[in-house]
Amino acid sequence: MIRNLPEGTKAALRVRAARHHHSVEAEARAILTAGLLGEEVPMPVLLAADSGHDIDFEPERLGLIARTPQL
């Protein structure tokens, strides 16, 4: 198994393996094989991965302001 994976990545791998009725090891092999063969990884899988980095959302710095919706 791959060592030092973030806990969120491990959890996502366990969920994906269960969804595909695979062991965690078999799912990891399938992901690596697909990645090396150029198959795209679905966006939800990428978003579920915990990269270990936090992103700060700063609306003011981005120039975003609240607006009243026009109905």
From Swiss-Prot:
GO terms for biological process: regulation of DNA-templated transcription. Gene3D superfamilies: Met repressor-like (1.10.1220.10). SUPFAM superfamilies: Ribbon-helix-helix (SSF47598). Keywords: Toxin-antitoxin system. The keyword Secreted does not apply. Transmembrane segments: none annotated. InterPro entries: Arc_rbn_hlx_hlx, FitA-like_RHH, Ribbon_hlx_hlx. Putative antitoxin component of a possible type II toxin-antitoxin (TA) system. The cognate toxin is VapB14. This is Putative antitoxin VapB14. The lineage of its organism: Bacteria, Bacillati, Actinomycetota, Actinomycetes, Mycobacteriales. The gene is vapB14.
